[in-house]
Amino acid sequence: MESQEFAIGEIEAFASKFYQGRPLLLTPYGYNLTFSSLTAGSSATQVVNIAANADFILTNIHHRANVAAAGQNVSTKVAPLARILITDSGSNEQFTNSAVDLENYSTNGNIINLLPYPRIISGRSTLTVQLASYEASQTLNIDVFFEGVLVRAYAQ
């Protein structure tokens, strides 16, 4: 798994290790959160509800930020001064030991920060996502997108 993204075969092989040879249906899927008006020095928390009928293999996290919904192009992208902490309720594990800088952890356009390894999140669980701004004065709008595949296992 050395490429910029995980290949389909790599994701299939990863999933099959955990489902003990059962037939699998993998469907590309994503979950999006929008944090509106994150003011300087504040924090906000939102929850992602994982589908009840499938597990989710997370392959990448992306974000897009803007200040006051201002237009952007490649050279004027906003690098938000915010930290993210993600907790999986199914395993009660945090993705990192503490909140980390969003730009260091998530992909923002041409800034590529891939997860080192896919992560399985159980169906019917939730991800609690906290963003904390450390901006001096800007109010941010930030979308955080969780990219991956839904996994449905069937009886043999």
What is each model feature region?
Residues 1-156:
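Beta-strand-centric surfaces of beta-sandwich/beta-rich domains
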